[in-house]
Amino acid sequence: GSEMCIRDRGYPEDHPMTGINGGSTVTTGFAHNAVLSNAGHIVELIKAGKIRHIFLIGGCDGAAPGRSYYTDFAKAAPMDTLILTLACGKYRLNDLDLGSIDGIPRILDMGQCNDAYSAIKVALALAEVFDCTVNDLPLTLVLSWYEQKAVCILLTLLSLGVKNILLGPTLPAFVSENVWKILVENYNIQKISTVEE
């Protein structure tokens, strides 16, 4: 137990750990309370055109090669964009060094699956400030599907009326052609293809 942890004290020398992209630094702690405490500055940057768009990249992850899409997407995101990330999908990009915009890191790690709540709180707060709906914000949701937790995130977003969600790299096995048609018609959900598209 705890006595063993105290006694063994870890590695005898520094033991570097890297993320999936080889990065050795990860900045975390950007749940809604941290982001919203800087909302004034973020809103100013949006109004000044210094932040042109916000991407939320998150969801469940897996080992399939197509999942590099999320890393590639983050790397290709223009320098005047922020990336909110959460859940296991964040490990595809949270060790990238993409710089900052006026002191705000371009990658904001909001936490795990349950912290999708934080991303929703931030989106709703921004919509209130700009007197618009979440769908009218300069915001794109890029969700990675792998297991049931991602369904909870997706259903929550759909229940809030959020549209234009990008979903992939594969679709849930239980989504029939008819269900997919309804999702596309009512919510304009799109299956991811290539980063360039």
Regions found by a protein language model. Give the residues of each.
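Proline-rich intrinsically disordered, low-complexity coils
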Residues: P12, P16, P65, P78, ...
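Hydrophobic alpha/beta core scaffold segments
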Residues: N38-D136, L160-I165
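Short, small-residue-biased leader/transition segments that mark boundaries at the very start
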Residues: G1-I6
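Charge-patterned, long linear interaction tracts outside catalytic cores
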Residues: V26, H41, D136-I192, E196
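Glycine- and other small-residue-rich loops at beta-strand/loop junctions that grip anionic moieties
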Residues: T28-A34, I57-G62, G111, V142-Y146, ...
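Gly-rich Lys/Arg/Thr-decorated short loops/hinges at beta-loop-alpha junctions or inter-strand turns
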Residues: G10-F30, I51, P105
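Domain-scale recognition of functional cores that engage charged ligands
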Residues: I20-I42, R67-S68
